[in-house]
Amino acid sequence: MLTAHKIKIIQSLDKKKYRQKYNLFLVESNKIIKEIEKSNYKIQEIFTNDLTLFNYKGVEVSAVSDVELKKISFLQHPKDSVALCEIKNSEIIDTDIQIVLDGIQDPGNLGTIIRLADWFGIKQIICSDDTVDVYNPKVIQATMGSFLRVNVVYTNIHDYLDTYPHAII
């Protein structure tokens, strides 16, 4: 159920501080929400204007009006559903090909890079600590679901590259 308190929490998730505090982020659009079920992300709750779309075991699905959806959406023209998801702990995986990013500040650019990495089959992106947060709503939207398939890890990239065992191009 969508309470005033929950609306306030969801609206606060546009800021990294609150995403970290609540360990939650927002995903918008039915297509991406349906993909989450096949990933290692956990959906806490789905808010939708069509209850017939989602029947996930252990996930609360709440009906909302278009007015309520507009309140909790970060989009100017909200889609039909919003999912509240838990942030997962990302750990570095051993993979030959990966992208290392330093200081990317534009959420749309990071989202596009993640989407391209997914398209090329790159499973991991290492980001410097000052790179925009992968769970920023604009990044999530720009990835078009690719954040589900690409592991994004934040670390000190100088230390990481000093100990990286594979060839660096």
Task: Describe each region flagged by the PLM.
Residues K38, D94-I169:
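RNA substrate-binding interface of SAM-dependent RNA methyltransferases
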Residues K21-L24, K42-E45, V59, K123-I125, ...:
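Short active-site oxyanion
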